[in-house]
Amino acid sequence: MSYIPFPDISPELFSIELFGVTFALRWYALAYIAGLLIGWRLVLRMIRAERLWSFGPPMTEDQLERLLTWVILGVILGGRLGFVLFYQPAHYLAHPLDILKVWEGGMSFHGGFLGVMTALVAFCLKERISILPVADLLAAATPPGLFLGRIANFINAELWGRPTTLPWGVAFPGEAAQSCPGIEGICARHPSQIYEAGLEGILLFTVLSLLVWRRGWLHWPGSVSGMFLAGYGATRFLVEFVRQPDAQFVSAGNPLGLAWQISGYGLTMGQILSLPMILLGLYLILRSRRTA
């Protein structure tokens, strides 16, 4: 069976030791930082482009700088709490202090999304500005961060896919990745992180950019946010078919790791969380057109 060996890339970009304590910059942290900076520059560019707006941009550049702090808190707190609540509630209920160990991994996009939405609503109410136009700005600027995050997932050899015999399957390192029932020798898996980087990163960013800069969708508040939600939800739903579910959902009687099933058919937790995003996205698109 042909497969691609996992590249020998350290998850740490570099590390330094100060006063006997080692501090490391990991690719995952760099992806978060770069994603936020790129997103900030993209939003700033859209704010300055007057032709994109019917009645001017929804907020000032000073307000954008203040919003960035709120978004950072929403991403980190929401992403971590989402992982705790959606994927491993029993473990963290028994070991609550482990919630603080963010350096060990464990972030949920759906939780981060809810965290950012909460921060966005609170910020807009505080600043007395419209929520949907600001949400459109953030939605259009989010995919580059998703792309970088998925690449970091690949470098960390985490969130890999299900076993495959396809020639582009990757032999990820580690006992968990190589534990494939019914497969002897090397176990190759779908590089689902790369699939997601291409779909929710490159493809979604291309679509949203065309809608913003060529089709003028920022003139219809809520439409860009709706397309982002529907697009991300749909791509994540599809990738879940080849993505390895979290270990706590997998058992001898449930090898596919379905969080909900009936008569042998069901959905993974990622698919369950993506369905409301798709429905809300379609609703926002239709609503924006009716109120245009």
UniProtKB/Swiss-Prot annotation:
What is this enzyme's class at the first EC digit? transferase
Where do the annotations place a 1,2-diacyl-sn-glycero-3-phospho-(1'-sn-glycerol) binding? Answer: R150
For this chain, the annotated S-S bridges are none
Write down the InterPro entries for this protein, in alphabetical order.
Answer: Lgt (IPR001640)
Kindly list the places in or outside the cell where this protein is found, as annotated in its UniProt entry: Cell inner membrane
**Gene Ontology annotations of biological process type:** lipoprotein biosynthetic process
HAMAP family listed in its UniProt record: Lgt
Which purpose does this protein serve, as stated in its record? Catalyzes the transfer of the diacylglyceryl group from phosphatidylglycerol to the sulfhydryl group of the N-terminal cysteine of a prolipoprotein, the first step in the formation of mature lipoproteins.
As for family, the record states: Belongs to the Lgt family.
* Name this polypeptide is given: Phosphatidylglycerol--prolipoprotein diacylglyceryl transferase
List the source organism.
Cereibacter sphaeroides (strain ATCC 17023 / DSM 158 / JCM 6121 / CCUG 31486 / LMG 2827 / NBRC 12203 / NCIMB 8253 / ATH 2.4.1.)
